[in-house]
């Protein structure tokens, strides 16, 4: 069995936010990794001075725990920077990994932190859970013996994203713990040295006597050793007794000095009976002071009550206070009763003790009678009774007039309607004219907007058609210019040739005329093709405009039908409401009449008693009746006025709507007629254009022939030919006029 060497121990006194949290004690595994343990112990004691690289004291005192990860570990030991980037060992810089024998298989183990292999410095960490993934990477060199709750408290601190605790966890003080056994051994050594000197004198005398008797026997030596042990025990006991006596002797003089001090203090000679009582504060007392007799009586009564009533038993006065309600409930407590228990059957006490007073109940019943339950809910837009009356009057008239206008659309012309409107306006007053103007302005704005939109669409289509026609005209003009230039060149060329070749045969002239006719036919065909293309484009644009007009008319028709259905629904609702209100008003009027009859009956009986008062009351009644009748008449007049105004305004609106419809229909009719005429023109124009183009070509060819012949022939023949050409021109003009009369749409087609 080897001797067990005691392992060194170190401690940390930790503070959280400068408040002491407790002490943590570590046991270092110096037998497994002595170099690492010596590094940690020296950093705890601070005995190695300053570091070589950091030039700071090699000491954990006032060092921070810079990293805390819950359910993993608590790290510290960076005495140079305090953020995990600094630190230094006592050996200077880093030192190598010593041993990985101890595994991270339990919590509260002390291990070295590093930056990789063989980079151990001063930083360490304490595990709070088993961490087997760190085995072989970090050296375990100790464990926590006490202060586990302090480590848990550090672990539970709140941290930021970098695992740094928000609270400041600092090591206030640190060092090495020396065990008590070492101190005892040192004291024993001292005692042995002192006892050995005293026992040596006694042993020398005894040895001289016994040496003569039995020097060779071994038993004597054993006895001597026993005796020495006994003497040592006796001496130790004596030393202990002497220490106790010394302690007692030290205490006794202090007690004697205290007794002397007590004796030295002066004793009081005043008796407690002679001390007067402390006076009461009566500075703010307004009442007269109570008499002494009253106080004595009260004191006596209290004493008697205490004698009669023991402390556990309740007083009789309190027992009598228990009151019982009529339903058998006990009322406990002190003070007045403020709440009454409600009756269980409310039907009994309904008339005797009702929640509402009788006059209030009568008013409630009367208010409920006046209400007439209408089945319909409130609809958005019902602002007042006047608006409802207006709608009631408007709606039936609108329906009838719409029907009439629909029947008369085809018969009446817009001019007749305008004349009728003028006649109606002459008969109306200025105030009505203003209303009409406002309504007409609104309608005109609406119509103008519609007309503008239609005009814009039509103008766009027209502008497109014009641009197309301009392009065509420009192309046509270019072609004609080219033709004219080519003809002039041909003429010059021909004149030169004719001068050179005057003696050519007539066959050549015939061939030339044939070639010219063929070229003219080709040109006429190309012109016809261009005209047909332009006509097709015009037809497409017209069909698109017709489709747009049809869609707009469909939308307007749908909107009209929706408006008609809405007006019918509103008229039905207004009729039902007005009917309900008339009923409620008639009921109220009957009730009012009955009350007046009752009052008159009562007043007649009173009038018999007091005839003077009855006259004054009759006058008052007459005045009231007259006022009420005047009010009713004024209300009826106002209602009639409103109805007449509404009916007139509705007539105007419907007339204006009818005119708009007629105007739109006439427009559609006129547009359709125009389209038909355009179609007819388009159908007629290609034939006429072809005729005209053929005639123009013939005339041009004849003129060219005449010019060529004139140059070759004599002046007499030239005159004859001129007369013939004039006749041909006259015939050509006549043909042109005929064509113009037969096809009136050709100019429009050319212009676009």
Curated annotation (Swiss-Prot):
Glycyl lysine isopeptide (Lys-Gly) (interchain with G-Cter in SUMO2) crosslink residues: 390, 691
Stretch forming the signal peptide: none
GO molecular function annotation: cyclosporin A binding; peptidyl-prolyl cis-trans isomerase activity
Sites bearing Phosphoserine, chain numbering: 252, 254-255, 257, 288, 313, 354, 384, 395, 411, 413, 685, 688, 694, 742-743, 751
A GO BP annotation: protein folding
GO cellular component: cytoplasm; nuclear matrix; nuclear speck; nucleus
Enzyme class: isomerase
Residue spans of biased composition, Low complexity class: 194-214
Region Disordered: start-end pairs: 182-752
Entries under SUPFAM superfamilies matching the protein: Cyclophilin-like
Basic residues bias locations: 182-193, 226-251, 327-345, 448-461, 599-625
Reaction(s) catalysed by this chain's protein: [protein]-peptidylproline (omega=180) = [protein]-peptidylproline (omega=0)
Location of the PPIase cyclophilin-type domain: 11-176
E.C. code: 5.2.1.8
Bias kind Basic and acidic residues: ranges: 290-308, 346-366, 377-447, 462-552, 577-598, 626-682, 706-752
The record's note on its domains: The RS domain is required for the interaction with the phosphorylated C-terminal domain of RNA polymerase II.
Quaternary organization: Interacts with CLK1, PNN and with the phosphorylated C-terminal domain of RNA polymerase II.
Name under which the protein is recorded: Peptidyl-prolyl cis-trans isomerase G
Organism the protein comes from: Rattus norvegicus
């Amino acid at each position: 069995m080897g001797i067990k060497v005691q392992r060194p121990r170190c401690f940390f006194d930790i503070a959280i936010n400068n408040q002491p949290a407790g002490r943590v004690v570590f046991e270092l595994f110096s037998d497994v990794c002595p170099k690492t343990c010596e590094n940690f112990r020296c950093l705890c004691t601070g005995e190695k001075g300053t570091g070589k690289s950091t030039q700071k004291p090699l000491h954990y005192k006032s060092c921070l725990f810079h990293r805390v990860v819950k359910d993993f570990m608590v790290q510290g030991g960076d005495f140079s920077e305090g953020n995990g980037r600094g630190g230094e060992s006592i050996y200077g810089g880093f030192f190598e990994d010593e041993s990985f024998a101890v595994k991270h298989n339990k919590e509260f183990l002390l291990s070295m932190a590093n930056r990789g292999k063989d980079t151990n410095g001063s930083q360490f960490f304490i595990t709070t859970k088993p961490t087997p993934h760190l085995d072989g990477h970090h050296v375990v060199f100790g464990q926590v013996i006490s202060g586990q709750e302090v480590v848990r408290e550090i672990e539970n601190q709140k941290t930021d994203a970098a695992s740094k605790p928000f609270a400041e966890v600092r090591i206030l003080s640190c060092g090495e713990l020396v065990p008590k056994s070492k101190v005892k051994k040192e004291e024993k050594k001292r005692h042995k040295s002192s006892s050995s000197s005293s026992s040596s004198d006694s042993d020398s005398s005894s040895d001289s006597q016994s040496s003569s008797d039995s020097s060779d026997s071994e038993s004597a030596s054993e006895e001597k050793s026993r005796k020495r042990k006994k003497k040592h025990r006796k001496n130790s006991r004596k030393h202990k007794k002497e220490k106790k006596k010394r302690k007692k002797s030290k205490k006794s003089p202090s007690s004697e000095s205290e007794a002397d001090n007590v004796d030295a203090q002066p004793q009081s000679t005043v008796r407690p009976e002679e001390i007067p009582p402390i006076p009461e504060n009566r500075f703010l007392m307004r009442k007269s002071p109570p008499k002494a007799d009253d106080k004595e009586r009260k004191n006596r009564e209290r004493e008697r009550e205490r004698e009669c009533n023991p402390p556990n038993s309740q007083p009789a006065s309190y027992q009598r206070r228990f009151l019982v309600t009529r339903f058998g409930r006990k009322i406990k407590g002190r003070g007045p009763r403020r709440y009454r228990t409600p009756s269980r059957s409310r039907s009994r006490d309904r008339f005797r003790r009702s929640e509402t007073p009788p006059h209030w109940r009568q008013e409630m019943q009367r208010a409920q009678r006046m209400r007439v339950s209408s089945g319909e809910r409130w609809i958005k837009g019902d602002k007042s009774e006047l608006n409802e009356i207006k709608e009631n009057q408007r709606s039936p008239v609108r329906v009838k007039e719409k029907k009439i206008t629909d029947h008369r659309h085809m018969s009446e012309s817009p001019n007749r309607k305008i004349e009728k409107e003028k006649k109606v306006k002459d008969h109306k007053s200025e105030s009505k004219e203003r209303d009409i103007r406002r309504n007409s302005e609104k309608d005109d704005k609406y119509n103008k907007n519609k007309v503008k939109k239609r005009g814009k669409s039509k103008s766009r289509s027209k502008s497109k058609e014009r641009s197309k026609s301009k392009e065509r005209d420009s192309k046509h003009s270019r072609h004609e210019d080219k033709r004219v230039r080519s003809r002039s060149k041909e003429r010059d060329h021909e004149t030169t040739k004719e001068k050179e070749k005057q003696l050519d045969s007539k066959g050549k002239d015939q061939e030339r005329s044939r070639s010219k006719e063929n070229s003219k036919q080709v040109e006429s065909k190309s012109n016809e093709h261009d005209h047909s293309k332009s006509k097709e484009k015009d037809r497409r644009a017209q069909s698109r405009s017709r489709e747009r007009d049809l869609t707009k008319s469909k939308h307007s028709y749908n909107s009209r039908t929706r408006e008609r259905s809405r007006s019918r629904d509103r008229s039905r609702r207004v009729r039902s409401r007005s009917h309900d209100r008339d009923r409620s008003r008639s009921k109220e009027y009957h009730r009012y009449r009955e009350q007046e009859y009752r009052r008159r009956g009562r007043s007649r009986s009173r009038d018999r008693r007091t005839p003077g008062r009855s006259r004054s009351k009759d006058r008052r009644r007459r005045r009231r009746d007259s006022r009420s009748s005047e009010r009713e008449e004024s209300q009826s007049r106002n209602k009639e006025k409103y109805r007449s105004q509404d009916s007139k305004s509705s007539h105007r609106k419907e007339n204006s709507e009818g005119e708009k419809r007629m105007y739109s229909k006439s427009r559609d009719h006129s547009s359709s007629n125009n389209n038909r005429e355009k179609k007819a023109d388009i159908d007629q124009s290609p034939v006429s254009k072809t005729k005209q183009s053929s005639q123009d070509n013939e005339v041009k060819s004849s003129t060219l022939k005449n010019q060529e012949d004139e140059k070759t022939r004599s002046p007499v023949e030239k005159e004859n030919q001129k007369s013939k050409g004039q006749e041909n021109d006259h015939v050509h003009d006549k043909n042109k006029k005929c064509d113009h009369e037969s096809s009136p749409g050709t100019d429009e087609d050319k212009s676009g």
